[in-house]
């Protein structure tokens, strides 16, 4: 049961990251605003 929960959380995290990268492809940190970082063209939310 615990393994299934961890797997589901990882799947959700990957889906969110893929969704963000498709919607908000970026070139530098200035395009992402104060709550995100641009890493290799992908928007990653930070806190």
UniProtKB/Swiss-Prot annotation:
Expressed in salivary glands. Highly expressed in the head, body and tail with a 2-3-fold higher expression in the head. Residues 22-27 form a propeptide. GO terms for cellular component: extracellular region. Disulfide bonds join 26-38. Residues 1-21 form the signal peptide. It comes from the Eukaryota. The modification Isoleucine amide is found at residue 46. The keyword Glycoprotein does not apply. Keywords: Amidation, Disulfide bond, Secreted, Signal. Its main location: secreted. Belongs to the annelide toxin family. Does not show effect on voltage-gated calcium channels, potassium channels, and tetrodotoxin-sensitive sodium channels. Does not show activity on Nav1.7/SCN9A, and shows very weak activity on cation channel TRPA1. This is Peptide HSTX-IX. It comes from Haemadipsa sylvestris (Indian leech). The lineage of its organism: Eukaryota, Metazoa, Spiralia, Lophotrochozoa, Annelida.
């Amino acid at each position: 049961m615990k393994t299934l929960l961890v797997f589901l959380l990882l799947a959700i995290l990957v889906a969110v990251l893929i969704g963000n990268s498709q919607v908000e492809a970026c070139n530098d940190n200035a395009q992402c605003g104060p709550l995100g970082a641009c890493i290799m063209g992908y928007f990653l939310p930070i806190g």
